[in-house]
Amino acid sequence: MAVYSAVAWILLFGVLASLGAQNPVSWEVQRFDGWYNNLMEHRWGSKGSRLQRLVPASYADGVYQPLREPYLPNPRHLSNRVMRGPAGQPSLRNRTVLGVFFGYHVLSDLVSVETPGCPAEFLNIYIPRGDPVFDPDKRGNVVLPFQRSRWDRSTGQSPSNPRDLTNQVTGWLDGSAIYGSSHSWSDTLRSFSGGQLASGPDPAFPRNSQNSLLMWMAPDPATGQGGPQGLYAFGAQRGNREPFLQALGLLWFRYHNLCAKRLAQEHPHWGDEELFQHARKRVIATYQNIAMYEWLPSFLKQTPPEYPGYHPFLDPSISPEFVVASEQFLSTMVPPGVYMRNASCHFQGIANRNSSVSGALRVCNSYWSRENPKLQRAEDVDALLLGMASQIAEREDHLVVEDVQDFWPGPLKFSRTDYLASCLQRGRDLGLPSYTKAREALGLPPVSHWQDINPALSRSNGTVLEATAALYNQDLSRLELLAGGLLESHGDPGPLFSAIVLDQFVRLRDGDRYWFENNRNGLFSKEEIAEIRNTSLRDILVAVTNVDPSALQPSVFFWLAGDPCPQPSQLSTQGLPACAPLFVRDYFKGSGFGFGLTIGTLCCFPLVSLLSAWIVARLRMRNFKRLQRQDRQSIMCEKLVGGVEALEWQGRKEPCRPVLVHLQPGQIRVVDGRLTVLRTIQLRPPQQVNLILSSNRGRRTLLLKIPKEYDLVLLFNMEEERQALVENIRAALKENGLSFQEWELREQELMRAAVTRQQRGHLLETFFRHLFSQVLDINQADAGTLPLDSSTKVREALTCELSRAEFADSLGLKPQDMFVESMFSLADKDGNGYLSFREFLDILVVFMKGSPEEKSRLMFRMYDFDGNGLISKDEFIRMLRSFIEISNNCLSKDQLAEVVESMFRESGFQDKEELTWEDFHFMLRDHDSDLRFTQLCVKGVEVPEVIKNLCRRASYISQEKICPSPRMSAHCARNNTKTASSPQRLQCPVDTDPPQEIRRRFGKKVTSFQPLLFTEAHREKFQRSRRHQTVQQFKRFIENYRRHIGCVAVFYTITGALFLERAYYYAFAAHHSGITDTTRVGIILSRGTAASISFMFSYILLTMCRNLITFLRETFLNRYIPFDAAVDFHRFIASTAIILTVLHSAGHVVNVYLFSISPLSVLSCLFPDLFHDDGSEFPQKYYWWFFQTVPGLTGVLLLLALAIMYVFASHHFRRRSFRGFWLTHHLYIFLYILLIIHGSFALIQMPRFHIFFLVPAIIYVGDKLVSLSRKKVEISVVKAELLPSGVTHLRFQRPQGFEYKSGQWVRIACLALGTTEYHPFTLTSAPHEDTLSLHIRAAGPWTTRLREIYSPPTGDTCARYPKLYLDGPFGEGHQEWHKFEVSVLVGAGIGVTPFASILKDLVFKSSVSCQVFCKKIYFIWVTRTQRQFEWLADIIREVEENDSRDLVSVHIYITQLAEKFDLRTTMLYICERHFQKVLNRSLFTGLRSVTHFGRPPFEPFFNSLQEVHPQVRKIGVFSCGPPGMTKNVEKACQLINKQDRTHFSHHYENF
């Protein structure tokens, strides 16, 4: 029951609603857009429909290319020769000017083809050289632009379907010039009150044009003024072109409102819509009647046939022939000026812009004029209408006044153009047929001679036809329809134009079912039709202007004799103001500086970012240094009393440095700001010291010249400071008994006389060269020549003596070292504190050519301090201490005593307290070969090759120079005996036993052999040709990096393909958009790079999916994709992307410039959603493109974000301010938001960024969520320990389910230092351990503060330690060590941390009998001193204790020792080997590992590995440390891989 009630109520409300919604009109309302005026073809005559040809098209290619010169004449030339003539010739039929402009109003109601087509195509008019209007300077390069009109996109495809233009208004006489061509346009014009059209402040005028009403707003060609002000809202888009058209538009506007007002009075119950539609219906009918039955007969001098009724099968479409015929005939009647009069026949004077007064409005200065002071009131408009009704038009012939011919409103940059030339180009654009073909098609008699076109013209002015014939090469078939039609005209349109126009109007009438005479459409009754037929334009004028009917003639389209208010005279150019001349608009005027400044600002983004990064880095370094200063005592308290501040001048090209000069007993010390001793000058008699003072420039320079030293030049702030130091030096010299001289020189001469350190260095270099040339028998030419420019320099070089500091520097040692003291004292025979050439030569001969006995005797004398011929145990301990000074190792006194006792006991001298030389030499008997190859190493001096060969040691890092195994010694001896007499080098066959030091690590007994000369062992012939080595190196490179190369090739192939696809598209396939015609290079570059950038910035996210990479490393994909190189690939992609971004920006800079100088008609084609061509022409300025568009503003912000991110991500700033890098790199979120917005505006093409971005973004977000789920869990620190060398050891809880592998790394954040700043560190714990551990070196502010925070707490609990956030683990290349049968681990500095975990993991797996593919690991630890990372020594010691299977071979390199094999290093080597032989431990580290002094020579080491492991075809090399070290390892691997033997696969990580 309830359901029935609901249905009843619904039906009741529906009936009530239908009763209340009555239709306000009782007839079928005519649409505004022209649809359904013909029911046969609904689209006929609608807005946007195409023109319908009367004659087939005539295009050059039969499709769309217009006919051009030279087939057709130049349009400007044709206009000048045929259509130019004087003004002031009245119409032969006395037609009025009102009829002329009413005809233009009718045409604006019927057709509009002026709208430029898209893409923009130009059919420019080339101006003949010296044209008086357009080329008065005779440049010969003037081109008037002509843009082709809009066409139907479905046409222009083939000769059977040639291009057809479209009509931008309705093709009916339906009042579209009054009400608009669309419903929305009409709504904009309406007031929606009383059925009237909206008016402005004055009811007689419509409101001004608004943005919602897209009126044509061309700039005033006379003044250049533009904008919508002063333009009225009409139905015709170009209704404001002249005041005369405006007056007619105002006439019909006022007439509609008058009709609506009368209807409202007659029918007060009607609403707005009913009133508006009734008034519109009546106005359109009146307009049709006047146009068809009053104006058309006056125009053609023919009466149209009687109305036969509506014919639905008749096509009423506008023809292109009609467009040209009607417009051109009207243009011949346009006068140079227009009168204005009142109802009493008073013709008004017109005040011009130059304050002059003329009798009429000048037409050429009235185009698109705004706010004309003579047309501000309704009376002014009435006066203009009355004046046009009384003024006789120009003669109907082929001539056109200059106001139309030369000063028509110009398109684009030109303020003026030739109207007739433009019309000729329009006809060619329309593809109009020739004059003869048109006559033939319309059934007119053919014309076979030029004189037959217009016999009257031929008789009166035959030269015109002759000139026309000459322009068309006497070929009548080429004569264009427009030119031929004009030549036919004489008082009336010629037969051709008349036939075209009449045919068009008849078809419009008969094919329109809304025609007012059609009594079947229900619009009007017969009485109303009769009333409309009796209404003329004179009636409209009288009704609107309220003038007396006697003030107007009966037919306002003619002025006949006897009609009221005759014109004063036929207007000519005489007495009228001159036309404003042509000017060319510069769209970029005033923008050059701002545009350049904008580009400069964009280019400064990286510089500003660089400056910001530098400031941040400086602040961070300042804070870091302040933290470091807090950890050590201030050095200011160590300043010596009496120090004098000065600047030391070091040479003309060297900067001055601030120093402190201290006078101490017997010496002068020069120190820097940190009190580091720069130089010590000994004051010993009988030296002669010279003090030279400057005598000019403030007398503030001092030169201290001491014999056998380089000079000290000091600059002071003032003379008083210099004088105080000089007095102190005088006193010190007198106190030490030194004589001195003092004089003054000009400062320039003083500095010229000074011997700088650099000059002294050149002298010492010559000294050493000639010294070694005598000792080592080096060729004199190889040693260099003494300076020969002056005898003084030669004498100085020969008499040069070395100071103690120079002697120490030449050995690469410190002057205060005990070794230097002992050596120098021994060599300085005369005790003068300097070594002469002969003294140095004597001791050098012993080291270079002496026997082992002579060398040991020299060593014995050096350390026999009391000179009694015996060395006591205390002296032996002092000697040993001097040996180990270089390593900065401070062994305890007990340890040194233990070493000495062991050496005495080993040699059988345990009962002796003192040793003779014989005893000392006997103690060194096992190291005879070491002493034999000992030399005194001098910095900068190359040792001859033979000495180098002798000095190569028996070690695992070099090729054996002695027979390496007992079973080979006899064979070596036999071969050597056989070849002893041969000049060839002795050879030794290849040894297959491990080298000596490696065998020692396996516990094999080593037998000592005498050194024998032989060539290096070769498994096969070594190809030495550079070409073969290059090929081999290339093969190894491909083998090492085949996965990298493959991935890079695939990635960049896709990137290049995307670039090429977009570049090809916009270069060759995007002509339909027209953008390549505007900016070819810019658009190709910007769109091609945009595609590549979109791909790169999307897929770069995958390189940062750490969890995904760690997982995929364990899959089969790792065989094809080098996941360990993800970070390097990330940097590689980023570097390429920023380069493409710069190119993309450069392309858009070109685009912006070209868009800023492109007219609006072109821009509206390129960006139809952004611009509408309203005739204003002026494009947007450059700043609009940069800062007021979404792509522009986001692009600028993107450049800023990228500049910040890239600068702070550089290696330099990342090391100095990791926090700055961390924070700025989080701009990537902002970056991707901007990228999405930037590409989503669809300015040039539809958005494509999401195609590349979605998949990587989803994967990346998922990976981040995985990290986020675990990295926000607080982890407690179990133990924190501060280790030497600024290393902090953290041991913290292992989260549940945390699985990792040795060599992996994690990211941690300390809650006390911020919860968002994560830093990566390698795990040093082994996977089997219950806790996790990190060793973190204090290398920056964050790690330094971390070290402070984890200082030892006062209690025993770990609760006071700040907690951590942990993210990881993540994989690295070092994780693959177990995949190689033999692996080499090379760690330097803090780069040893990943190997600590690997070593512990390997030993653990071997101890539990776990199957491991890796059979041998060589661990090379490179450190400045063994004390640098003592925590690693503890780990190595643990490994040695647990390594029962000898899986790990550890070698430690101490690089702070002298790098070359000098005497002291030899002795240190002897002591180290002796200590290791006795206690099986290193003297320095306390480990069983082999300790070496210097840097590891990787290439010989890798060579020896091939001998030790001949069956292993691939060895893994893993290095971690500074870039210099990893580069050396990489270089060694590349060199070894040139040989076609064992392959070394290198994986490295820098820190």
Swiss-Prot record:
Domain EF-hand: 815-850, 851-886, 895-930
The enzyme's E.C. designation: 1.11.1.-, 1.6.3.1
Entries under Pfam families matching the protein: An_peroxidase, EF-hand_1, EF-hand_7, FAD_binding_8, Ferric_reduct, NAD_binding_6
Topology relative to the membrane: Multi-pass membrane protein
Residues holding Ca(2+) 2: D864, D866, N868, E875
Region (Peroxidase-like): 26-593
Subcellular location: Apical cell membrane
Keyword terms, alphabetized: Calcium, Cell membrane, FAD, Flavoprotein, Glycoprotein, Hydrogen peroxide, Membrane, Metal-binding, NADP, Oxidoreductase, Peroxidase, Repeat, Signal, Thyroid hormones biosynthesis, Transmembrane, Transmembrane helix
One GO-annotated biological process of the protein: response to oxidative stress
Organs and tissues of expression: Expressed in thyrocytes (at protein level).
Predominant place of localization: membrane
CDD domains registered for this protein in UniProt: dual_peroxidase_like, EFh, NOX_Duox_like_FAD_NADP
Parts of the chain that traverse the membrane: 597-617, 1045-1065, 1081-1101, 1137-1157, 1189-1209, 1227-1247, 1249-1269
Class of enzymatic activity (EC top level): oxidoreductase
Signal peptide per UniProt: 1-21
Binding site for Ca(2+) 1: D828, D830, N832, Y834, E839
Domain FAD-binding FR-type: 1270-1376
Subunit structure as annotated in this protein's UniProt entry: Interacts with TXNDC11, TPO and CYBA.
PANTHER family (alphabetical): DUAL OXIDASE 1, NADPH OXIDASE
Identification of the protein by name: Dual oxidase 1
The species this protein was found in: Rattus norvegicus (Rat)
Encoding gene per record: Duox1
